[in-house]
Structure formats: structure tokens, C-alpha cells
Amino acid sequence: MLNTLIVGASGYAGAELTAYLNRHPHMNITGLAVSAQSADAGKLLSELHPQLKGILDLPLQPLVDVAQAAKGIDVVFLATAHEVSHDLAPQFLAAGCVVFDLSGAFRVRDAAFYSQYYGFEHQHPDWLDKAVYGLAEWQSEDIKQAQLIAVPGCYPTASQLALKPLVDGQLLNDAQWPVINAVSGVSGAGRKASMGNSFCEVSLQPYGLFTHRHQPEIVAHLGTPVIFTPHLGNFARGILATITCRLKAGVTAQNIADAYHHAYQNKPLVRLYQQGVPALKAVVGLPFCDIGFSVQGEHLIIVATEDNLLKGAAAQAVQCMNIRFGFPETQSLL
């Protein structure tokens, strides 16, 4: 059994993560933690997330002394704000823990990225170099050797799973950037109350035009420029990305289907549609990314869907953990 500490368990993704790990046969949850200043400190997780009542009636402990909290811990999951993960991860790593960070604090190796897109100066370039980007279907060999796994963002997961087989297969016309229009549920903004996310205010609205931090994350790991426009939808959870591309001359729908099949035929958490495209309802509450496409001449439209809290966060973190420790990849997820 691996002793596990979850920091940031009070949030939406943190609660989903805790539920997955609670039913994992090789994980022992030794503690749930929140920041010392958190209003949730001292409460039961099931008070904040009633669906866990009678299942996870565990207290949320204030994290005061990292060195003390790390004693006897094998695995740490950080479902915390970017700046918090930036400060905490190196301390847990120094204590010998394997860390899975769900924030953006270690996803991109360029330190300048963080001052531009996250608003803080990165102080740990050594860990930026050592961190492995946890896009599970594509980085499994590196994940197996890593001490720090940076779990990808929700939008980048859907976008890269949809595009990477085609980029790597050199099937796209380089003269035209892929255009990603993605809609996310309000849970992507977290539990903290805000006027813009309140019931009567939330609408279907684009945001972060040309400035969203997930755009350079996608570009850094996909290896090709893209235009990315996120949208906030008036629903609780899930992401649907519609991606338009131009194909190289002579590339057919069968070439696209073959590329996807080759990439994901043995990847159980990516589901490919032979006909039609996925709807959001097929993935909400499940750990899958569903992908479908349509071709007309040299034009390609891809639709990718996922639950932003699961394949876009908690489920992928557990998937990475399973890969890292040699467990079945879908253990506790299916």
C-alpha cells in the first residue's frame, strides 16, 4: 500500500481525486489537507461534498508543517493553486515523495512562461527541467521514471489528444494553424464564489482571447502553433472542443482514421467514434476523452469531449499514478 496525502481536497477536482483514490486497492489515504488559512480547515470533506457522506467523512487538516506532513508519505497529490503548488512541490520532493501536481506550476519548462501567463516568477528551474508532462497516453515511458508529474490542463488534454496523432503523422497543412474552439462548464473556474460564475450571470461567452495560459501550454507540447479560444458554458462540468484544420493535399478520411487507431487502439481512456461526433453527456462523470471527426475535401473538423474534472484533472492524475507505479492503467477509474 502506498501512503497518500491529498492537498487541496476541498475543491471540485480534489474531491473527485479523493473518491478515486479511496477505492484504489493500492492506495492508503493518510491525510487530506488544505492551506492553513482555508475556511474549510477542520471541516469534513463530506460536509463540502455531500455525495461523499458515509464514504469519505475525513477531516480537512490545515497544512502547517510540510516536513511533518511528508513523514511516512509515498505519494502527494497537489490539487492547489499554481503559486501554492510552486512552493509546496519542491518541499515534498525533497522529502522523497512522488508528486502529482494538478496545477500549472510545472507544465512548461520555460520559466518566462510563468511570469507572463501566471503572474509569478518561477523559482525552481531545476524542477521545471525534471518534471514530466503527464499526458498519459503519450508520455507513459517518461511517467514511469518521474518523481514530479505535471498533470496537464483540462483544455490542453482534449486538444492534444485530438491533434497529436495528426501532427505527429504530418497529416496537417502547416500553412494553416489548427483552430480550437472549446467550451467548458463552470466547475473549471473552481469552487470559489464569483459574480461572473453565479447562476443568474453565467452565460455562453468566450474569454481569454489570444491570452489564455492554456494556448502556450498546448503549443509547447504539441509542437505546432494553434489558435485557441476558450468559452464558458452555462453548465456545471465537461469540455467540448471543436477543432478545424486544413489537411495536406491527398490526405483522406481513412488516413485520419488510421492515425487515430494507431495512436489509441490500446489506450482504453480514449474512445474513437467510427461515425458521427461525441456529445458532452457521454463523458460527464466518466474518465474518458471521446473523439470524432468529419472530412470534406482538405478540410477537417474534429470534436473532442471530456469531463474537465476527470480526464481533464483527477482521472488523468490517477491514470498517471497507475502508470508510475505499474498498476493497471484504469485501476479505480472504471
UniProtKB/Swiss-Prot annotation:
GO terms for molecular function: N-acetyl-gamma-glutamyl-phosphate reductase activity; NAD binding; NADP+ binding. Its main location: cytoplasm. Catalyzes the NADPH-dependent reduction of N-acetyl-5-glutamyl phosphate to yield N-acetyl-L-glutamate 5-semialdehyde. It is an enzyme of class 1 (oxidoreductase). GO terms for biological process: L-arginine biosynthetic process. This is N-acetyl-gamma-glutamyl-phosphate reductase. The gene is argC. PANTHER family: N-ACETYL-GAMMA-GLUTAMYL-PHOSPHATE REDUCTASE, CHLOROPLASTIC-RELATED (PTHR32338:SF10), N-ACETYL-GAMMA-GLUTAMYL-PHOSPHATE REDUCTASE, CHLOROPLASTIC-RELATED-RELATED (PTHR32338). SMART domains: Semialdhyde_dh. Pathway: Amino-acid biosynthesis; L-arginine biosynthesis; N(2)-acetyl-L-ornithine from L-glutamate: step 3/4. The keyword DNA repair does not apply. The active site is at C154. CDD domains: AGPR_1_C, AGPR_1_N. Belongs to the NAGSA dehydrogenase family. Type 1 subfamily. Pfam families: Semialdhyde_dh, Semialdhyde_dhC_1. Keywords: Amino-acid biosynthesis, Arginine biosynthesis, Cytoplasm, NADP, Oxidoreductase. Its EC number is 1.2.1.38. The keyword Signal does not apply. It is found in: Cytoplasm. GO terms for cellular component: cytoplasm. PROSITE patterns: ARGC. Signal peptide: none annotated. It catalyses: N-acetyl-L-glutamate 5-semialdehyde + phosphate + NADP(+) = N-acetyl-L-glutamyl 5-phosphate + NADPH + H(+).
